[in-house]
């Protein structure tokens, strides 16, 4: 049974490889990123910019790699989950990095104003 599952996982990886984007920069939890998202409105498509802090990241080297981004939209905090290898994402740009000590930053949901800021790392 185990031999079949390893063959199946190898087959799945070989199928996924052509669809994985290679030009995505290294993104860590705590980074402030900006990404372009293609949005279809009726018959038109436009690029929508989304900028925010990465709260969580799942499956680092897979086709299903996703990240949770917390943006502020008209003064209200909004969390969105993006699949990095989605064809709707046009670009990803790291704006600033932060020093963190947690794997997931879900505690930022409850903090407002200055309390919700992260300590910036200067390279």
From Swiss-Prot:
InterPro entries recorded: Ribosomal_bL19 (IPR001857), Ribosomal_bL19_CS (IPR018257), Ribosomal_bL19_sf (IPR038657), Translation_prot_SH3-like_sf (IPR008991)
Lineage: Eukaryota, Rhodophyta, Bangiophyceae, Bangiales, Bangiaceae
Gene3D superfamilies, per database record: 2.30.30.790
Protein family according to the UniProt entry: Belongs to the bacterial ribosomal protein bL19 family.
PANTHER family, A to Z: LARGE RIBOSOMAL SUBUNIT PROTEIN BL19M, RIBOSOMAL PROTEIN L19
PROSITE patterns for the chain: RIBOSOMAL_L19
Pfam families: Ribosomal_L19 (PF01245)
Cross-referenced HAMAP family: Ribosomal_bL19
Gene: rpl19
Single biological process term from Gene Ontology: translation
GO cellular component: chloroplast; mitochondrial large ribosomal subunit
Main localization (coarse): plastid
Claim: Plastid is one of the keywords in the record: yes
Subcellular location: Plastid, Chloroplast
GO MF annotation terms: structural constituent of ribosome
Protein name stated in the entry: Large ribosomal subunit protein bL19c
Species the sequence originates in: Pyropia yezoensis (Susabi-nori)
Keyword field: Chloroplast, Plastid, Ribonucleoprotein, Ribosomal protein
Xref: NCBIfam families: rplS_bact
